[in-house]
Amino acid sequence: MSAQVIAIDAMGGDFGPRSIVQASIACLSATPSLHLTLVGQPSLLEDLISGLPAADRARLQVVAASEVVGMDERPSQALRGKPDSSMRIALELVRDGKAQACVSAGNTGALMALSRFVLKTLPGIDRPAMVAAIPTQTGYCQLLDLGANVDCSAENLYQFAVMGSVAAQALGVHRPRVALLNIGTEDIKGNQQVKLAATLLQSARGLNYVGFVEGDGLYRGEADVVVCDGFVGNILLKSSEGLATMIGARIEKLFKGGAFARVAGAVAMPLLKRLQADLAPARHNGASFLGLQGIVIKSHGSAGVQGFQSAIQRALIEIQENLPQRLHGRLEDLLP
């Protein structure tokens, strides 16, 4: 297998580079064909990788960046005021062909603005969208947009549906079912943009559009791709993650309540731990910026080692599936 090269914004996120570097080292150990470029403060990064075995160190490069984009900075400041930020340098490595993907846990708005400026969008795409896998009763669905576009036109939603369908196919879903997230399944439900998007999707050739889906239908697995604006999608994503964490904590507390509960917990806990691990946000961390002329994966700023590993793994899959090129090849057929 040919080498995959991923540029890592090592200075982004809430906790600094330590967990990012640990996740990067773990991915190197698990994937012999992987090469990583850590972008950030060289002295700090070199210290964190100083004990790495020579074989792994040979697949790890450090590229200097003198600036860091803060988590609370405006995108305009990152775009105009920090030309040597670790985030920007990582994206420029992708643009220049020195890396095949960029992974960052940094400021979402800044990452989107820089990605659009440095990498540009694919022909026919007005706005990139954030997409991630959401666990359902039957497997997973791809949910987009997750916050990059708070206000969306019907045409934006249509483009998101096209991109989501192609992404789901790249991840192994045959003829993915595409749905619009709505407050009901009847044709009369929804705001004007959702209704107009439905009209566009109903007439689209090559898309398996199945209509509207409600929030509970998403979790029942009624669609493989669920489309909404970024305002709704971000709230849904954060609510899902909070619910999964709360359920796990409540279950653990329940089985510590008394002697009988502890005995029952000892029997049930292995299965419950498996369920908790399957639903854990860290396992599904990593949202893809679809619609760019390059692969960009956004990790949660609060992600730990396992979460950042998941983001790198998503980047690997998209590299292996050549996702931007696949998108480009399908857009001419599916966009009006």
Swiss-Prot record:
Annotated catalysed reactions: a fatty acyl-[ACP] + phosphate = an acyl phosphate + holo-[ACP]
Keyword list, A-Z: Cytoplasm, Lipid biosynthesis, Lipid metabolism, Phospholipid biosynthesis, Phospholipid metabolism, Transferase
Molecular function terms from GO: phosphate:acyl-[acyl carrier protein] acyltransferase activity
Cellular compartment(s): Cytoplasm
InterPro entries (UniProt xref): FA_synthesis (IPR003664), Phospholipid_synth_PlsX-like (IPR012281)
Pathway: Lipid metabolism; phospholipid metabolism
Keyword DNA repair among record annotations: no
Gene3D superfamilies attached to this UniProt entry: Isopropylmalate Dehydrogenase
Pfam families: FA_synthesis
BP terms from Gene Ontology: fatty acid biosynthetic process; phospholipid biosynthetic process
SUPFAM superfamilies linked: Isocitrate/Isopropylmalate dehydrogenase-like (SSF53659)
EC annotation from Swiss-Prot or TrEMBL: 2.3.1.274
Group of enzyme by EC: transferase
Main location class: cytoplasm
Top-level taxon in the UniProt lineage: Bacteria
Subunit structure: Homodimer. Probably interacts with PlsY.
Role description: Catalyzes the reversible formation of acyl-phosphate (acyl-PO(4)) from acyl-[acyl-carrier-protein] (acyl-ACP). This enzyme utilizes acyl-ACP as fatty acyl donor, but not acyl-CoA.
Family as reported in the entry's similarity comment: Belongs to the PlsX family.
NCBIfam families hit by this protein: plsX (TIGR00182)
Name by which UniProt lists this protein: Phosphate acyltransferase
